């Protein structure tokens, strides 16, 4: 049985459906504190997925918490860990390019809120500087997308 390590800081009420998808696909989940990210395969600790619940959370991480987020990516790089940020959003955001057309809901109340084009540029720069990938999925597909990404990385690195 393949084991997925799930970070203990993942909130139980947010991951019920994800864990059901893991179980249905016959993956065992073990909760443990991870150095970086939220998910990894037990057999491949050098690839992690950092799950974000939506673009609003991702925007907060890379804008308001920019230094902390960069420090986490640098720590991963220093340890040889590849990070993939998986952002749960709607069907309108399927790629990094699509982020350009995102309309930040905070713009209604704050004209200085981050726009989609700006967020795209920040994510692209982080991708270049820290070799981080940004992937997107619908909320109902998160568990399956995590499995797909973990398996693909394992195959690319000769793990499976």
Question: Model-flagged regions — what are they?
Answer:
Residues 47-53:
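Conserved catalytic cores of phosphodiester-cleaving nucleases, focusing on short active-site segments
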Residues 1-44, 57-160:
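Non-catalytic C-terminal interaction segments of nucleic acid-processing enzymes
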């Amino acid at each position: 049985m393949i084991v997925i390590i799930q970070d203990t800081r993942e909130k139980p009420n947010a991951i019920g459906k994800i864990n059901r998808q893991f179980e249905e696909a016959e993956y065992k989940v073990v909760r443990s504190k991870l150095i970086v990210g939220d998910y990894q395969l037990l057999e491949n600790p050098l690839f992690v997925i950092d799950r974000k619940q939506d673009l609003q959370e991702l925007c907060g991480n890379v804008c308001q918490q920019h230094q902390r987020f960069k420090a986490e990516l640098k720590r991963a790089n220093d340890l040889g860990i590849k990070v993939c940020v998986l952002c749960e959003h709607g069907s309108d955001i399927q790629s990094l390019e699509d982020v350009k057309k995102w309309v930040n809901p905070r713009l209604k109340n704050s004209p200085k809120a981050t726009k989609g084009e700006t967020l795209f540029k920040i994510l692209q720069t982080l991708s270049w500087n820290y070799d981080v990938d940004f992937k997107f999925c619908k909320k109902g597909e998160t568990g399956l997308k995590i499995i797909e990404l973990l398996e693909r990385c394992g195959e690319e690195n000769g793990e499976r």
